[in-house]
Design a protein with these regions (language model features):
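Active-site-flanking alpha-helical
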Residues: 137-146, 174, 206
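Solvent-exposed interhelical
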Residues: 144-156
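Membrane-embedded alpha-helical segments of multi-pass membrane proteins
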Residues: 29-33, 124, 174-181
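Juxtamembrane helix-loop-helix connectors linking adjacent transmembrane helices
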Residues: 7-27, 48-130, 148, 216-218
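Structural signal for the C-terminal ends of transmembrane alpha-helices
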Residues: 8, 40-49, 185-189
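Functionally important transmembrane alpha-helices
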Residues: 153-218
Length: 218
């Protein structure tokens, strides 16, 4: 999602073609490289080769697929509820202070474009590329580096804060920090695969809500 946020910022006020180019330039190189790295590490992990253990793809022993799916559903519902409460609190606070909050960059970009190809790319990014690339980058990469030098009580919130700030808008930071903390918690206890699935499920539900909102507009 960070790539889409940055692309939206770059494409604000531009035509559809410029928005598309900005989106592609900001989004695809970072995410494709990260997904390529993910595939290499996954192959190494399955083969028991060096560096493969860095991925941490597998869930802890003793958890069945059914148990993981049940946990995924509960985690998704909990994350939806928590982020909704935080978002509403931010909106109420901004309203009380007389501050007008702008729509997220990706929301404005998709609403202004109306391009099926742009919507398709955004959907692919949000539900596949972003979960894979961002979980590898933040939950394994950045958190692994920080945890090597700092206590976990500092490494985890710092990783979540970096995850939030990369998405580009100040008023979304509290919500995104909560998402980052939740994904790190899931990753450490249930493996990277579960964190990726939760990230993808959450993003897909947000895109669905956005689509319903756009369709409901006159």
């Amino acid at each position: 999602m960070a790539g889409m946020a940055l692309a939206g910022r770059a494409g604000g006020g531009l035509g559809e073609r410029s928005a598309w180019q900005s989106l592609a330039l900001a989004l695809l190189p970072m995410q494709v490289c990260a997904v390529g790295t993910f595939v290499v590490l996954l192959r190494r992990e399955r083969a028991g080769r060096p560096w493969g253990a860095l991925l941490g793809w597998r869930a802890p022993a003793g958890l069945t697929t059914r148990q993981l799916l049940c946990r995924l559903g509960l985690e998704w519902l909990t994350l939806l509820a928590v982020t909704l409460l935080i978002s509403q609190a931010v909106m109420w606070g901004a309203r009380a202070l007389g501050v007008e909050l702008e729509a997220q960059h990706v929301v404005r970009l998709l609403q202004a474009s109306g391009s099926p190809s742009l919507v398709a790319l955004a959907t692919l990014s949000a539900t596949v590329l972003a979960p894979l690339s961002e979980e590898l980058l933040f939950r394994r990469g950045l958190h692994g580096v920080l945890a090597w030098r700092l206590p976990a009580r500092l490494a985890t919130p710092l990783t979540a804060l970096c995850f939030a700030l990369l998405h580009g808008q100040l008023h979304t930071v509290p919500t995104l920090v909560a998402i980052g903390l939740a994904l790190q918690w899931v990753c450490q206890r249930e493996g990277l695969r579960q964190a990726i699935l939760l990230h993808a499920t959450y993003n897909a539900s947000q895109l669905l809500l956005l689509a319903l909102t756009v369709l409901a507009e006159p």
